[in-house]
Amino acid sequence: MGNPVLIGVAGGSGSGKTTVAKELYRQFQNDSVTMIEQDSYYKDQSHLSPEERALTNYDHPFAFDNDLLLAHLQELMQGKAIQKPIYDFKVHNRKPEQIQVDPKDVIILEGMLILEDERIRNLMDIKVYVDTDADVRIARRIVRDIEERGRSLDSVVTQYLNVVRPMHLQFIEPTKRYADVIIPEGGYNRVALDLLSTKIGNILLEKQQFTNQS
């Protein structure tokens, strides 16, 4: 295996970045591809009570263990397998078990704040920002948090107004300037997805040719 292609897919909560990342994953399944979610790298909170964990600001950069994420990305790019954490959103903490991720030719990194950390950003071959209207994002977040994370409507709306929206404006939206590609309307933008897939394929081919010549 040559040097992997690392694609970063960022964007606000509910922007459709996960849909974009999964679509790219689907398109490259014939090649060697893996996906890493930044959400898996929320910090371990075993030392906190359940009440204290619930008060954590999960939309702030400090909520993530970027040192571990960086180390794991570097290991994957060096051809080494990693043990990826598994995060349980219902108890706001990591699960005891981990999942092994093997090195692949294409690595898709997905998360709202992956472009905020310069160390991680500099590893990427292509930086993508999924840009979606705030009204659409909050509607998607409400559905997701209620159906997938066991939250109440009141708690989701309160968190959005007090935490999610301010953090988006302060930390997530500004990272758009680092993006090589900005995709409006997320996974529904077929033209952007097709162009991005073609570009990734070209980079992968170039890296494979370089490796063969070395």
UniProtKB/Swiss-Prot annotation:
Q: In its keyword annotation, does this UniProt entry include Cell wall biogenesis/degradation?
A: no
Q: Which reaction does it catalyse?
A: uridine + ATP = UMP + ADP + H(+); cytidine + ATP = CMP + ADP + H(+)
Where, per UniProt, does this protein localize? Cytoplasm
Reading the lineage from the top rank, the first entry is Bacteria
Q: Which GO terms describe its molecular function?
A: ATP binding; cytidine kinase activity; uridine kinase activity
Q: In which broad location class does this protein mainly occur, judging by the first location in its UniProt entry?
A: cytoplasm
Q: Which GO terms describe its biological process?
A: CTP salvage; UMP salvage
Quick one: a GO cellular component term? Answer: cytoplasm
| Keywords recorded for this protein, A-Z | ATP-binding, Cytoplasm, Kinase, Nucleotide-binding, Transferase
Q: Name one Pfam family in it.
A: PRK
**SS bond partners:** none
Q: Which InterPro entries match?
A: P-loop_NTPase, PRK/URK, Uridine_kinase, Uridine_kinase-like
Q: What class of enzyme is it?
A: transferase
Name its pathway: Pyrimidine metabolism; CTP biosynthesis via salvage pathway; CTP from cytidine: step 1/3; Pyrimidine metabolism; UMP biosynthesis via salvage pathway; UMP from uridine: step 1/1
Binding of ATP, residues = 11-18
Q: What is its EC number?
A: 2.7.1.48
**Tagged with keyword Kinase:** yes
Q: Which family does it belong to?
A: Belongs to the uridine kinase family.
Question: What's the protein here called?
Answer: Uridine kinase
| Biological source species | Brevibacillus brevis (strain 47 / JCM 6285 / NBRC 100599)
